[in-house]
A protein has these predicted regions:
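Short S/T/G/P-rich N-terminal loop/turn motif that feeds into the first structured element of a domain
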Residues: 1-50, 56-68, 76-91
């Protein structure tokens, strides 16, 4: 399994809008991605939020994660960085 560790910045005062977008668009889209295993979105802190999305292969992780530097049109979220890691263990 491979994980995508994603760091995003949320525009100040737009946390509720970002959460609504996450629930309505991002979560359903990620669930349908090829090789999807699990994903976790962590609550924002100081305008930054992290997510971890786990896929069955590195290829699917790279295909299912957003590119760094992306801001969807009209979105209050900017994708700062995306890292890919092999999952060593889970519980």
């Amino acid at each position: 399994m491979h994980a995508a560790l994603i760091t995003v910045t949320i525009d100040p005062g737009k946390e509720d809008e970002a959460r609504a977008m996450l629930d309505a668009q991002v979560v359903p889209m990620v669930r349908q991605a090829a090789g999807f295993v699990a994903a976790y979105w962590l609550e924002p802190h100081d305008g930054k939020a992290l997510s971890i999305a786990v896929f069955d292969s590195e290829e699917n992780a790279k295909a299912g994660a957003p590119p760094a530097g992306m801001r969807p049109p009209g979105s209050p979220v900017f994708v700062e960085s995306v890292e890919f890691h092999n999952v060593m263990a889970n519980a």
